[in-house]
Amino acid sequence: MKLIKLTENYKNEWESLINEFEINQEKLIPFGVKGNCESFLEFLIESENNSKGLDLARGIVPSDIYFLVSNDSDYLIGAIDIRHYLNEGLLKSGGNIGYGIRPSERNKGYATQMLALALEKCKEMQISKILITCSKDNIASANVIIKNGGILENEIIENGIVKQRYWISRDMFNINKG
């Protein structure tokens, strides 16, 4: 498995991933998979700008969106968004990382592998402490975070939803090498 940034030849796979979330009437997670883009070309430009910190909306921090693929396929299994640093809002509930696996590929261990690969990217970016949050009722996501060294700091209530805040420090990055 590997994380990639999309190029022009991934248009159909990108559309397929988005379509699967829509068919299942699910919120597209992470938001950066599509953002506010109407087209794939617009997505590619926005992703590049986000990575460089260009033309960001107020309150948005630079981020990199990666997609999980197997080593021998272009099929997009999931996506993970790495935010370069935390602002006040992200420190409270958004965290450094947001991720999602397409509905048909869940419960196969992909999220755990994807997060482990993303933590390696964080290491390359010299992000030494990672905050990841999830809803308390999202037990699968909590397990993914814990398997990758996440330590629960606390729980907060946001818009009536209990969110758990986990920290992973650089010395914990190599916990899961799945």
Regions found by a protein language model. Give the residues of each.
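Conserved catalytic-core motifs of GNAT/GCN5-like acyltransferases
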Residues: 133, 146-165
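Glycine-/small-residue-rich active-site loops that bind phosphorylated ligands and cofactors
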Residues: 74, 89, 106-107, 137
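Charged catalytic carboxylate motif
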Residues: 13, 114, 140
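Conserved beta-strand-loop-alpha-helix junction that forms the acyl-donor binding cleft
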Residues: 132-142
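Conserved GNAT acetyl-CoA-binding A-motif
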Residues: 122-133
